[in-house]
Amino acid sequence: MIILCFDYGIKIIGIAIAETKLNYSTPIKSIFNNKKKNFWNQINIIINMWKPKYIVIGYPYKIKKKINKKIKKFAKEIKKKFKINFFLCDENYSTTEALLFLKEKKKKKKYCLHSISAKIILDSWIRKNI
């Protein structure tokens, strides 16, 4: 079963994918979240290419931020546009964990940080739900 995960950020959206039959997940892409909403074209391509059964979206439950409303709006748009069930998953500390991973790998690309965060969120959701 294919599952996609989005780490929605104000500037960048990280994307990861999992294949549960293979017990494997990987970061696949980070896309810029711009005010013109051009990112929907890229999300459309990714969803149509992978045809996921579920979509997981990172959500900071323990922290009340303005981003929470934007994440919920993004999640509702996913459901409306693609008719795919989504799940919100606690994303607290996923960026910190991704930064530690990048430090170990001696990579400091902020761009890939978000897709690695998405992978961490996805792995967490799979451990709890699959």
From Swiss-Prot:
EC number(s) per entry: 3.1.-.-
Enzyme class: hydrolase
UniProt xrefs under Gene3D superfamilies: YqgF/RNase H-like domain (3.30.420.140)
Pfam family, one: RuvX
GO cellular component, one term: cytosol
Subcellular location(s) per record: Cytoplasm
GO BP terms: rRNA 5'-end processing
GO molecular function (one): nuclease activity
Entry keywords, A to Z: Cytoplasm, Hydrolase, Nuclease, Ribosome biogenesis
Main location: cytoplasm
The organism's place on the tree of life at top rank: Bacteria
Protein family according to the UniProt entry: Belongs to the YqgF nuclease family.
HAMAP family named among the record's database cross-references: Nuclease_YqgF (MF_00651)
Protein name: Putative pre-16S rRNA nuclease
Summary of the function given for this chain in its UniProt record: Could be a nuclease involved in processing of the 5'-end of pre-16S rRNA.
